[in-house]
């Protein structure tokens, strides 16, 4: 039973801004949760409530979200059974907040950051009440098998561009994906060895300054285009000895360089007043992706087009979707209504699952199940602004999605998730298996 939800503003996430953390006091003890924060956010995401008071944290404070927990949510939680996850989530989202857009519940009154912190803490309390691990409890909530469980392939973001880096590179993330490993533990070893090899290659080619790391632990050397980044990755994978065992994934984050008036994409968007020679139409971008997939071992492309460019998403999925995972992040924002539209338009074939995009554990599970029911892949994801909370590590095992991206094997807030997955793999023993190259298949 819930006794008293306590909360604190002053924990920082990884970019040095405050975020919401909750301590949920129950008859079983105290259960804590902290929420992450994105940088390149989709316009259809549930609202992350910030104070916009420029005198505190340059407007990034979360006092209003904290106040909403204290004055609106907390009084309604006292005495409730923490095992009633769906009932409590729906109460917060639909009754206490109640804000809505054409895409569903928007959390614009209380803030998705306020609601999600409580939702995560309640989930942890529910697991304790059921005397089980968090990953098995969430699996039960989702109606999944808890006897044999799946460890995910890590998608390690090792080269940064786009809005995450100060270089010229337009595409936001280049990831290494160790699909050829026999276990999660070995996959992380493959990934770490490629990462350190890449660091040496970057240092030789671009200088020691180029090995500074970005928000997610990846490198941001002065790379000019995707070909250069991919050549560097292929060379590092080969030098580390993992050719054919480690593949490549990209997050383009194309909404960041889309011009809605001209319906074009500027691959030189970080150069002010550029000569427009790298401006592409949607079709030209489709052709570029097809060319890259033919030349490099790319198995997944996330956000290849703007969040409203349904037409070109569908073209690309039709062209290469059989062999390559086309992932919707800004396109879908973990929103079941957006997923339904994408299914109707055959726009993509995979969901990027970010719990803070939708704002409650119940809705995140719903988005995952809808995607899996329609034979999509699902990649569980961190945000670029993270805390040491490891909830998503348990979530990816619970939902059997077979793939997770939570940064490079660098920076403690990233490695915290990978370390939790090491622990889960160890605890499962023979009852856990590694997704490997079957990460796109239904592992239910």
From Swiss-Prot:
Signal sequence extent: none
Q: In this chain, where does the modification Phosphotyrosine occur?
A: 137
Q: How is the cofactor bound?
A: Binds 2 Mg(2+) ions per subunit. Mg(2+) is required for catalysis and for stabilizing the dimer. Unlike for mammalian and yeast enolases, Mg(2+) is dispensable to form an active closed conformation. Inhibited by high levels of Mg(2+).
Cofactor(s) needed, names only, are: Mg(2+)
- What SUPFAM superfamilies does UniProt report for this protein, alphabetically? Enolase C-terminal domain-like, Enolase N-terminal domain-like
Where along the chain is the active site annotated? 216 (proton donor), 354 (proton acceptor)
N6-acetyllysine PTM sites in chain numbering? 131, 373
Where's it found, cell-wise?
Cytoplasm; Nucleus; Cytoplasm, Cytoskeleton; Cell surface
One Gene Ontology MF term: magnesium ion binding
Where does the motif Pentapeptide insert lie? Answer: 102-106
Q: Which residues carry this modification: Phosphothreonine?
A: 337
Answer yes or no on keyword Cell membrane: yes
**E.C. designation(s):** 4.2.1.11
Q: Where is this motif: DKSLVK motif?
A: 275-280
Query: Which parts of the sequence bind Mg(2+) 1?
Result: 40
Q: Which GO terms describe its cellular component?
A: cell surface; cytoskeleton; food vacuole; nucleus; phosphopyruvate hydratase complex; plasma membrane
NCBIfam families from the entry?
eno (TIGR01060)
Q: Please explain the role this protein plays, according to its UniProt record.
A: Glycolytic enzyme that catalyzes the conversion of 2-phosphoglycerate to phosphoenolpyruvate. In addition to glycolysis, involved in various processes such as parasite development and invasion. Plays an essential role during ookinete invasion of the mosquito vector midgut by mediating the interaction of the ookinete with the midgut epithelium and, further, by binding to mammalian host plasminogen in the blood meal, whose conversion to active plasmin promotes the invasion process.
Q: Quaternary arrangement and interactors, per the entry? A: Homodimer. Forms a complex at least composed of DegP, ENO and HSP70. Interacts with G-actin. Interacts (via the DKSLVK motif) with mammalian host PLG/plasminogen (present in the mosquito blood meal); the interaction occurs at the ookinete cell surface and is required for ookinete invasion of the mosquito midgut. Interacts with A.gambiae EBP; depending on the Plasmodium species, the interaction is either involved in ookinete invasion of the mosquito midgut (P.berghei) or is dispensable (P.falciparum).
Q: What is this protein called?
A: Enolase
**Could you tell me which species this protein originates from?**
Plasmodium yoelii yoelii
